[in-house]
Amino acid sequence: LTETGIHYLDARGPDGMRLYAIGDVHGRHDLLAAMHRRIETELEYAPATDWRIIHLGDYVDRGPDSKSVIDFLIEAQKRDPRNIILAGNHDIGMLDFLANAEPDGLFMNYGGVQTAQSYGVDFTRDMHWFGKAEAVARGHMALVKAVPRSHVYFLRSLPFSVSFGDFFFCHAGIRPGVPLDHQNLQDLIWIRDAFHDHQELFSKVIVHGHTPVPEAEVKANRVNVDTLAWKSGTLSALAVNGGDKQIIDVQGKAL
């Protein structure tokens, strides 16, 4: 017997628990703080018995202030563990770079230079003098010194998925045909086409980011809230209250 999946329109959050799932932040501390203010205001005016704020990964790279984003998330989680913070491929890429200075990896090619700048390390200056390989080696040494241990431990501690009610949350998506509790961690932070092209319903509605869209995308089987915040200045989230679902946005300046 094939299990019938859950359609977005029928999906419900747990009774009495408000859910918020926030898309890729990429160094936009301003937008993350604005989204939290917006959610806090909502919870003040329409109190919920319980709530979870789920961050869908990619806190670092590209945008201007990755360091402050990580500081903000560490504080938020200390203040209330109902702030759930999932791993994205860029967050794992930063850990990988700190462990091994790969000159042509994700970090150096896709916005890690901006992350390093937020910690006071300037890769571009050294490239001018030394060429890439030497500049990366020097920058790597400086960055390992500059990134607080607490940030490294935090990045290492991030889970790859979480589920509440009829929703399954992860950074990139899932591999169709594989049970949700048996997903490969690489797929959860990297998958694109095999997931996006899948039209059938899943056992839960998948809420994800990773692949930027001009505005949040709601499909029968998934919701994508990555609205390219670092560049567009729009950070999006899915808000779930029982059977009621809506997309919320905060706006800042485009870069």
Q: Positions of the model-derived regions?
A:
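Short, motif-level signal for alpha-helix interfacial/capping segments enriched in acidic residues
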Residues: L1-Y8, A33-R38, K67, R149, ...
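Active-site neighborhood of phospho(di)ester-bond hydrolases with catalytic His/Asp-centered motifs
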Residues: I22-G23, I54-G57, I84-G88, V205-T211, ...
